[in-house]
């Protein structure tokens, strides 16, 4: 026991010496529990973010280090119009570079998450492309589809964890969107529908590529895709599409913001590095992923966040008391 205490003292001394040789540690004196922090955050009036001004979505600062991206066309059931496909890309490109943001919650305003693509607004682009030459029309449509695909790929490429909070219907493009998110919560009344076959086309902006890897049950994915049937909340939970189901939207959003607060209290170097490596590992072999991880961590292991975390643990302080620098 005495030997262990001596080793711990020496390790603590070494950590303190290294910290003094770089920069001073600053601790957040607040030791509030996650639940109390989440309750306070849920009561806080959201503040609009000045550099996020959009027609189809609304971005607010839900709490410290957490942004709330809300699909904001409730009168149109949050249908995805022309502006949406452009604005969501711009939004997440900004979030990716926002050093103050550490987690994002995505939800829908009104009675449902989204009804999918706004066919009334997008019909001319898709059904009446410009030109009369088959090859040139094909090039136009390929470019159009590629731009739509980028709308959701930008979520996946954003290093900050993205939590989808789904209520009511999540139809068509909505499934493409949530498949690109990192964590999915839903309400008991939520349903999910790969709707594209009902309008005569194959889903082309991410569902067919990501959903099999999210659920891990190709037979079920094929069934949902070929029939456009609704998957209800309980089945979504059983299949792994969502990780938790809540009785209503308010309870779900409070839980999503609490989760985001918990994530944002961790080292952003560790969290964002974990997301990047999880996605890389999904698409590569174990050996390739291990090699990528080794290359990644040969620089990331030099972060002061490790020293701060170890010191807090040895001093038996709440990890939420640590102040991590922006990333």
From Swiss-Prot:
InterPro entries: ClpP/crotonase-like_dom_sf (IPR029045), Ech1-like (IPR045002), Enoyl-CoA_hyd/isom_CS (IPR018376), Enoyl-CoA_hydra/iso (IPR001753), Enoyl-CoA_hydra_C (IPR014748). Residues 1-33 form a transit peptide. Pfam families: ECH_1. The keyword Ribosomal protein does not apply. The modification N6-succinyllysine is found at residues 230, 316. One of its GO terms (cellular component) is peroxisome. Pathway: Lipid metabolism; fatty acid beta-oxidation. Its EC number is 5.3.3.-. The modification Phosphoserine is found at residue 267. The record marks 196, 204 as: Important for catalytic activity. Coiled coil: none annotated. The modification N6-acetyllysine is found at residue 326. The keyword DNA-binding does not apply. One of its GO terms (molecular function) is delta(3,5)-delta(2,4)-dienoyl-CoA isomerase activity. It comes from the Eukaryota. Expressed in heart and liver (at protein level). A motif (Microbody targeting signal) lies at residues 325-327. Isomerization of 3-trans,5-cis-dienoyl-CoA to 2-trans,4-trans-dienoyl-CoA. This is Delta(3,5)-Delta(2,4)-dienoyl-CoA isomerase, mitochondrial. The lineage of its organism: Eukaryota, Metazoa, Chordata, Craniata, Vertebrata.
């Amino acid at each position: 026991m005495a030997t262990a205490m001596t080793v711990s003292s020496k390790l603590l001394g070494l950590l303190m010496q290294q910290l003094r040789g770089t920069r001073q540690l600053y601790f957040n004196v607040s030791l509030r529990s996650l639940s109390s922090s989440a309750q306070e955050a849920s009561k806080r009036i959201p503040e609009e973010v000045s550099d996020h001004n959009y027609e189809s979505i609304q971005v607010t600062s839900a709490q410290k280090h957490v942004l709330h991206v809300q699909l904001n066309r409730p009168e149109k059931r949050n249908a995805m119009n022309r502006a949406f496909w452009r604005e969501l890309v711009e939004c997440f490109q900004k979030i990716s570079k926002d050093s103050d943001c550490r987690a994002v919650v995505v939800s829908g305003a009104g009675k449902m998450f989204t009804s999918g693509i706004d066919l009334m607004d997008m019909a001319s682009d898709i059904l009446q492309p410009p030109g009369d030459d088959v090859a040139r029309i094909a090039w136009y449509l390929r470019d159009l589809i590629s731009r739509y695909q980028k709308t959701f790929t930008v979520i996946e490429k954003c290093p900050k964890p993205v939590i989808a909070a789904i209520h009511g219907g999540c139809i068509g493009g909505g499934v493409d969107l949530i498949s690109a998110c990192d964590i999915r919560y839903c309400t008991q009344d939520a349903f999910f529908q790969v709707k594209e076959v009902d309008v005569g086309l194959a889903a082309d902006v991410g569902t067919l590529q990501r959903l099999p890897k999210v659920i891990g049950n190709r037979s079920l994915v094929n069934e949902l895709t070929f029939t456009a049937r609704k998957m209800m909340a309980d089945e979504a939970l059983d299949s792994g599409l969502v990780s938790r189901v809540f009785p209503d939207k308010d309870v779900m959003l409070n839980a999503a913001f609490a989760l985001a607060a918990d994530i944002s209290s961790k080292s952003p170097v560790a969290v964002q590095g974990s997301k990047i490596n999880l996605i890389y590992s999904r698409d590569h072999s174990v050996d390739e992923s291990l090699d990528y991880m080794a290359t990644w961590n040969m620089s990331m292991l030099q972060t002061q966040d490790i020293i701060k975390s170890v010191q807090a643990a040895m001093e038996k302080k709440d990890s939420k008391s640590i102040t991590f620098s922006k990333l």
